[in-house]
Design a protein with these regions (language model features):
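C-terminal amphipathic alpha-helical interaction region
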Residues: 384, 391-439
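A short small-residue
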Residues: 48-58, 349-354
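Low-complexity, highly charged intrinsically disordered N-terminal segments
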Residues: 61-65
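Sequence-structural signature of the catalytic-core scaffold of metal-dependent phosphohydrolases
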Residues: 1-25, 37-48, 57, 68, ...
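Hydrophobic alpha-helix feature that most strongly marks membrane-spanning transmembrane helices
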Residues: 246, 250, 254, 308-320, ...
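Substrate-recognition/cap regions that form aromatic- and gly/pro-loop-enriched pockets
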Residues: 316-398
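Acidic, low-complexity proline/glycine-rich segments
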Residues: 31-43, 335-341
């Protein structure tokens, strides 16, 4: 069984030999949070699509606002869970357990850092390029494990790479975050050879030893050696729950603002989480609020509060199984019947009316095309760097990416690092320039 005393560590990745905890107002895990907020990759999230196209006159969520909101919910989940565990096991009071809220909050901030531009279509475009597109020509030139990495490219694994990899000119250890924050980000703690049809995995072959080091230090349960697989770090369940709560609620709220859902439909969806007595009380409160968007915001906040309670209880009810590495599914799948039914109904409505709406499909089509084109040109450039046009493209890439590495797989990874780090706006601008549709001002 995994142990809370070892699962939570302030040791920093890349600074293991120099680890010395500072006794200041900020804990080591709060430092993780601040370090992420002040980073360039985090700032770039403001120009990355969440679901809907980046805003015109109506402001909807982007990756940045989504990550901040997930972080807030994650902090509440972590704080509530820590409080309950300490009531059960007061001997843990002098451990790092009271810091769970800060750890989960920091991990939530970082959970989408590895996602490419243009939302889910951008993330799908990368593995599709290798499994169905021109990238298929590379299969015979790469070892099987590296090929699996490419054909199952996953934003979560890419986030772990971004946070731990030593890019050119940067310090060892990447962001140099604490072991526990890093482990809490990895939803799928196994290699790409176990990715399966869902294409989910937690680390590329280049970062496998880094993850192994972290997992062994924290005492995470190893399930398999080759291919490598661990049970999740328990705090991953809280990060996942915060994400599940936020994307469902915020997509509904955004759909209302964009008039994809009517006010009546939205109110009914949000009220369906509650029993009749609570529902009647909430409707009375709505009588005092005349602004329709504020009414929806109030109902949304009530649902989020309820789901935080439900997921907290689900974690506590299953703590032993989670620590044994035997818990299956997400916490949201283990909540009470009424909110579970309402959540599933919201998910169905989101699929039918939101994710298949014209605006969402248009941005997915454009994003897929843009990412595929950039990949095609950049991969060809690193395969044939001697060509004149290849040199023009390669010289366009920031020096932090090892685009001229002697090993082909490392050059391909540099291309993926470069493209996945782009904002929607930057990727679109580069696409237009490459196609001759936009010329720089002279």
């Amino acid at each position: 069984m995994m142990n809370w005393n070892t699962l939570i560590s302030a040791k920093r990745f890349g600074l293991e030999e120099f680890h010395q905890e500072r006794h200041e107002n900020r804990s080591e895990f709060q430092r993780d949070y601040d370090r992420l907020v002040f980073s360039a990759p985090f700032r770039r999230l403001q120009n990355k699509t969440q679901v809907f196209p980046l805003p015109g006159s109506i402001f909807v969520h982007n990756r940045l606002t989504h990550s901040l909101e997930v972080s807030c919910v994650g902090r509440s989940l972590g704080t509530d869970v820590a409080k309950a565990i300490l009531a059960r096991q007061p001997e843990l009071q002098n451990s790092y357990l009271p810091e769970i809220g800060s750890i989960v909050s920091a991990a939530c901030l970082a959970h989408d850092l590895g996602n490419p531009p243009f939302g889910h279509s951008g993330e799908r475009a990368i593995p599709t390029f290798f499994s169905e597109g021109k990238g298929m020509a590379l299969k015979e030139q790469l070892p099987a494990a590296q090929w699996e990495d490419l054909t199952h490219f996953e934003g979560n694994a890419n986030a772990f790479r971004l946070l731990t990899h030593q890019f050119e000119g940067r310090r060892k250890g990447g962001f140099v975050l604490t072991y526990s924050t890093l482990a809490s980000i990895v939803k799928y703690p196994f290699s790409s050879s176990l990715a399966g049809k869902k294409s989910k995995f937690g680390f590329f072959t280049t970062e496998e030893e880094s993850f192994r080091r972290i997992a062994e230090e924290l005492g995470m349960k190893r399930l398999n050696d080759d291919p490598l697989k661990y049970a999740r770090h328990p705090l991953v369940y809280l990060v996942e729950a915060a994400d599940d709560i936020c994307y469902q609620m915020m997509d509904i709220e955004d759909a209302h603002k964009l008039k994809i859902l009517t006010t009546g439909e939205t109110q009914d969806l949000l009220l369906s989480y509650f029993p009749e007595e609570r529902k009647a009380h909430m409707l009375k409160t709505l009588d005092f609020v005349s602004d329709v968007n504020e009414q929806i915001a109030y109902l949304r906040s009530c649902v989020i509060g309820l789901l935080i309670q439900e997921c907290t209880q689900a974690f506590l009810n299953n703590e032993e199984r989670i620590l044994e590495g035997e818990f299956e599914g997400s916490l949201i799948k283990h909540i009470s019947e009424l909110p579970a039914s309402a959540y599933n109904h919201c998910a169905d409505i989101s699929l039918k009316k939101i994710y298949r709406s014209r605006d969402v499909l248009d941005i997915e089509l454009a994003g897929f095309r843009i990412i595929s084109t950039l990949l095609d040109l950049m991969i060809d450039a690193v395969r044939s760097p001697e060509k004149a046009y290849s040199q023009l493209l390669i010289n366009r890439v920031s020096g932090q990416y090892n685009i001229k590495a002697p090993i082909l797989y490392e050059r391909i990874q540099a291309v993926l690092d470069y493209i996945s780090g782009m904002t929607d706006v930057f990727a679109l601008d580069l696409y237009r320039k490459i196609n001759g549709n936009s010329l720089p001002a002279v």
